[in-house]
Amino acid sequence: MPIRSNMRFSARAARRGALALVLPLALGMAAVTTAHAQSSLYDRLGGLKGITVVVDDFIDRLVANATLNQNPAIDAGRKSSPAPYLKFQVSQLVCEVTGGPCKYTGAAMKPSHAHLNISENEWNVMAGEFKKSLDKYKVPAAEQAALFEIVGKTKGDIVVRK
């Protein structure tokens, strides 16, 4: 009978030993998954380097876009806010709203865009150019969706005509 008792003890010990080996692995995997899920959008975009590379390409696309160039207010706005300045301001803004360390120092969206007379179509063109820049630098779909959700919240402050 003592042998049987020992067998139960051994089986329990084996289960505990297996649990002792598997539990840290499972907890480690959960920690990695949680760390990724909790990492900021800023970090997932590659930090300031990733953001500035995409923004640089995006602003260059906007400056060259024929549809946007037909809007005289946008064309005039480029004289007061040249591309290098826009690249800085947009990078700073994206950095802040995605959880990065930057502090946006530019004007609020509504007053800084009101004079540009941006239409719904021009908004869509800008969104398309942004998507092209994100795709060019292989920004993953989840991060793109998060960015477009953030950008979408500014539409009411930027679009002033149908």
Where are these regions (language model features)?
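Bacterial N-terminal signal peptides
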Residues: 17-30
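Core of compact, soluble alpha-helical bundle domains
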Residues: 35-162
